[in-house]
Amino acid sequence: MPPHRSRRRKRASATQLYQTCKASGTCPPDVIPKIEGRTWADQILKWGSTGVFFGGLGIGTGAGSGGRTGYVPIGTRPPVVAEPGPAIRPPVVVDTIGPTDPSVISLLEESAVIDSSIPVPTDTSHGGFNITSSASGPSSTPAVLDISPPTNTIRVASTTSHNPVYSDPFTLRPSLPVEGNGRLLTSHPTIAPHSYEEIPMDTFVVSTDTSNTVTSTPIPGPRPTMRLGLYTRVTQQRPVATTTFLTSPERLVTYDNPAYEGPAEGTLEFEHPTIHEAPDSDFMDIIALHRPVLSARQGTVRVSRIGQRASLQTRSGARIGSRVHFFHDISPITRPSEAIELQPLGSSSTAVSTTASSAINDGLFDVYVDPDIPPSHALPPLRSPTHVSTVSLTSLGSVPAQTANTTVPLSLPTNINVGPDLSPPESPPFISTRPVSPSFDSVMVLGWDFILHPSYMWRKRRKPVPYFFADVRVAA
């Protein structure tokens, strides 16, 4: 098997080499003479043409056509073709002017004399003014012109014909029902029903609000929650400790200008000179502060603004910089460290005792809830048409202590029968066998009107971060 030979690459033409290597001076020695016509063959033709001329014989290296005039027999002349020249115009005869001829030449030719005795026709159909003139001598009275317009009679012609295809629109409208003498009178159109198809209309917008009238204007839905992108990798985070950021954020970017009254709630734009220094170093090169945003973040109420830096500026005027998130925490949202205990109405270090008494007309009955207090220790009965609820607190021991009473007036409906005085069964006092140290209060709650402590409620695993916008959206 013969060995594999590499394929020979074709060399670039002399014209291509001349275009690339002429400026750099790296051309091969045979390229420049060939392109510029300085080879030995070109020199011999140049020197030989000075002594010998073969132009009339048509000898050359062309296609063999015999030159411009072609091949002709020897001893004859080629035909002569007349070339087109300028068009020949006829000469213009110029009349000579003698010394007796007038210097002013009339442009109009002479015509015959017009006879003015021919009457001029008058057209009176145009409806204008009729002017009558009369010739008079120098001693006669001036002429009187009659300028009153002639009376034109207007003629109106009308033709009436019956068209069976046309129907009066009045007959197409059905009359409204009329009620008279307890009867409902209704009339129907006498025209036959139409032959076209009725297409039902679809309701594109459905409103659940029945108080307002549905119109043709579409009802916009709720706006989707905007993602501000405050906490991204490309946004720098800069906390601001001063409260000036809430009222006058422009004072942190530039120095105070008394004549400037810009919108504190909108987008603030700044123009800085070439060399400047901001009052706050965190606000260096800031050219725009966008609208504020309220949000709840990590248990605090936070005010945020997006700032745009202009760290670089190109020759075309474009500014390049990063985005900065400036935020200030207004107040923390902290949870109480310990539970809040509800205090009773009558404050004392004793147990709860409730006495209710009521009297309707002449009847009265008392209810003693605390069995430790006999009826003799209760308040005397009150003869009044309203309830009196008494709350007294006693200690847990066997001996009742002083009571702190709170009187609350109550009322009962009148349809409840009044019964006799009732007293719950009494039991011997409880004596503890072990010392109580320290002593604590006990509250007995009988009822269902209580509030569950928030710590016993279910907690969500993920707490959402709601956003509250100052003006709905943030300018980009």
Curated annotation (Swiss-Prot):
GO molecular function per UniProt: DNA binding; structural molecule activity
Amino-acid biosynthesis found in the keyword field: no
Pfam family, one: Late_protein_L2
GO CC terms: host cell; host cell endosome; host cell Golgi apparatus; host cell nucleus; viral capsid
Major localisation: virion
Location of the motif Nuclear localization signal: 1-12, 458-465
UniProt keyword terms in alphabetical order: Capsid protein, Cytoplasmic inwards viral transport, Disulfide bond, DNA-binding, Host endosome, Host Golgi apparatus, Host nucleus, Host-virus interaction, Late protein, Microtubular inwards viral transport, Phosphoprotein, Viral penetration into host nucleus, Virion, Virus entry into host cell
Location of the protein in the cell: Virion; Host nucleus; Host early endosome; Host Golgi apparatus
Cystine connections: 21-27
InterPro entries: Late_L2
Function: Minor protein of the capsid that localizes along the inner surface of the virion, within the central cavities beneath the L1 pentamers. Plays a role in capsid stabilization through interaction with the major capsid protein L1. Once the virion enters the host cell, L2 escorts the genomic DNA into the nucleus by promoting escape from the endosomal compartments and traffic through the host Golgi network.
Listed name of the protein: Minor capsid protein L2
Upper taxonomic lineage: Viruses, Monodnaviria, Shotokuvirae, Cossaviricota, Papovaviricetes
